[in-house]
UniProtKB/Swiss-Prot annotation:
This is GMP synthase [glutamine-hydrolyzing]. The active site is at 93 (nucleophile), 185, 187. It catalyses: XMP + L-glutamine + ATP + H2O = GMP + L-glutamate + AMP + diphosphate + 2 H(+). The keyword Plastid does not apply. Residues 17-211 form the Glutamine amidotransferase type-1 domain. GO terms for cellular component: cytosol. XMP binds at residues 313, 482, 537, 543. Homodimer. SUPFAM superfamilies: Adenine nucleotide alpha hydrolases-like, Class I glutamine amidotransferase-like, GMP synthetase C-terminal dimerisation domain. Its EC number is 6.3.5.2. ATP binds at residues 240-246. The lineage of its organism: Eukaryota, Fungi, Dikarya, Ascomycota, Pezizomycotina. It comes from Gibberella zeae (strain ATCC MYA-4620 / CBS 123657 / FGSC 9075 / NRRL 31084 / PH-1). Keywords: ATP-binding, Cytoplasm, Glutamine amidotransferase, GMP biosynthesis, Ligase, Magnesium, Nucleotide-binding, Purine biosynthesis.
Length: 545
């Protein structure tokens, strides 16, 4: 690894940073979103993180909620050094119970009544530093609870700062140390003044300066990229036409000019006319070095007979890197004896924070990982371990989707690219359940084209964050032209989301949904039935595989 990497300061070296330790909650990421909306930089790591390996000191720590019981044998915990850092600690839900349980294992037990949803919470003013968490927020709040276990006995050294009907210790604070616990979820939007509570903790108790803003990101990241890459090395990067890779490519162009080479790989899994449209759009709006590589035969050949989703992602990720390493050698050779001469050392990806979080296991075990993301866990081991010919460069990995869109606008990227629906690197390969074959790719490609076209025609494309058609591995009986058919089931999915960490199904009008279904069944040979996926994220993910 280049020495420049050591001198390029990461954000936590520049900004006061609140560390969020994830205990497994489905809403842990919302804590980060609330902090960043306040201008406080934050990072989330699994609760298994060892403090001695952290390499930096946060100004405060938040322990998230989680689905476990603190008294269970396999309950997740945190490094005891968290409480020896000398910084404020806030426990949320499970994190609150963990703080109490560490002080007294008898203090946490199952409650008599489960407490889910909104409830009224009374704030207790006790005349000590414990009042600072709810300072300026009145005498009561409507808060969101989601728990069965609770603190049933106040641990020694703690005081009660809030109660509800079913939780006598809905808020606790240590008498002398800046350690707080709350049983409710301030990160959920339905909690009254939840963001204010997080602000009190981060800015008043931790003393974090609210100076994280996207305006600073471009200059800082360009400086970091230049230090990291140096004066001679060249960078190649995958582009798909999606907002993530487009913004990353534009940033690299700004940082190192013509030493950045964008590569659009046609892996045989693109949408209808995707390659031509993406090339035309990127050429028109970005002015970058762009090469189109046809890898369709290679990808489809390697995927033949493979049905397991993780295996497909790994194959696709590995094949991408194989092709990029070949392209790197070609670029180096063409640049010989020119002012662009230099080794291709870096591979650019538009990885976002959501990609990293989705690939994380909060317990540190592979079994807890949601799935390998194509921009994270889908890369071959040699790439992740730095053993490949190319080293990984991910300048957007600290940002959420909405932050990337805002950053793209700051860079002057055309709205046509900023507002484009996401399309995954593995393409239609993860929208075909089971084996990927040329026949099945063509079927889902046609269905997807009809779906997206009708969304555009209805004038709702910009209301939908992401939409696509997928193909199930099972088949269903149908009747077409008085004849029995036995065809595939097409799954339609459309969601709305701010940051891609959570999502809700889009509510189509019934007439439009029926019209879409009718066209797909009538116009796409091989499809006998159409269904609409109404699963939220969580518990589902946006992509099916």
């Amino acid at each position: 690894m280049s020495d420049a990497f050591e001198t390029a300061a990461p954000p936590h070296a520049t900004y006061d940073t609140v560390l969020v330790l994830d205990m497994g909650s489905q809403t842990s990421h919302l804590i980060l979103r609330r902090l960043r909306s306040l201008g406080v930089y934050s990072e989330m790591l699994p609760c298994t993180q060892k403090i001695k390996d952290l390499g930096w000191k946060p100004v405060g720590v938040i322990l998230s909620g989680g689905p476990s019981s603190v008294y269970a044998d396999d309950a997740p915990g945190v490094d005891p050094l968290v409480f020896e850092l000398g910084v404020p600690v806030l426990g949320v839900c499970y994190g609150n119970q963990l703080i109490a349980w560490r002080a007294n294992p008898k203090s946490v037990a199952p409650g008599v009544n489960r407490e889910y949803g909104e409830t009224q919470m009374a704030i207790h003013k006790i005349g000590t530093h414990g009042d600072r968490l709810f300072e300026g927020l009145g005498d009561s709040l409507n808060v969101v609870m989601s728990h069965f276990d609770k603190v049933v006995q106040l641990p020694d050294g703690f005081q009660t700062i809030a109660t509800t009907k079913n939780s006598e210790f809905a808020g606790i604070a240590h008498e002398t140390q800046p350690i707080f616990g709350i049983q409710f979820h301030p990160e959920i939007s339905h909690t009254e003044k939840g963001t204010d509570i997080i602000a009190n903790f981060a800015t008043k108790i931790c003393g974090a300066r609210p100076d994280w803003k996207m305006d600073d990101f471009s200059a800082r990241e360009i400086k970091r990229i230049r230090e990291l890459v140096g004066d001679k090395a060249q960078v190649i990067g995958a582009v798909s036409g999606g907002v993530d890779s487009t913004v990353a490519a534009k940033l690299m162009k700004e940082a190192i000019g013509d030493r950045f080479h964008a590569i659009l790989v046609d892996q045989g899994l693109m949408r209808l006319n995707e390659c031509e449209q993406v090339k035309e759009t990127l050429d028109k709006h970005l002015g970058i070095n762009l090469t189109v590589v046809d890898g369709s035969e290679l990808f489809l050949g390697r995927l033949a007979g493979v049905t397991e989703p993780e295996a497909k992602r790994k194959i696709i990720g590995g094949t991408f890197i194989d092709l990029f390493e070949i392209e790197a050698l070609r670029i180096e050779k063409e640049a010989e004896n020119t002012d662009r001469a230099g080794k291709v050392e870096w591979f650019l990806q538009g990885t976002l924070y959501a990609d990293i979080v989705e690939s994380l296991s909060f317990k540190g075990a592979a079994s807890s990982t949601i799935k390998s993301h194509h921009n994270a866990g889908g890369l071959p081991a040699r790439m992740q371990n730095g053993e490949a010919q190319l080293k990984l460069l991910e300048p957007l990995r600290e940002l959420f989707k909405d932050e990337v869109r805002a950053f793209g606008r700051q860079l002057g990227i055309h709205e046509e690219l900023i507002g484009r629906h996401p399309f995954p690197g593995p393409g239609l390969g993860i929208r075909i359940i089971g084996e990927v074959t040329p026949e099945r790719v063509e079927i889902v490609r046609k269905a997807d084209h009809i779906f997206i076209s009708m969304i555009r025609e209805a004038g709702i494309y910009d209301e939908v964050t992401q939409a696509y058609a997928a193909l199930d591995s099972s088949r269903a009986v149908g009747v077409q032209g008085d004849a029995r058919v036995y065809g595939y089931i097409c799954i339609l999915r459309a969601v709305t989301s701010l940051d891609m960490m959570s999502a809700e199904p889009y509510e189509f009008t019934w007439s439009l949904m029926k019209a879409i279904s009718r066209r797909i069944v009538n116009e796409v040979d091989g499809i006998a039935r159409v269904v609409y996926d109404t699963t939220s994220k969580p518990p589902g993910t946006i992509e099916l595989e």
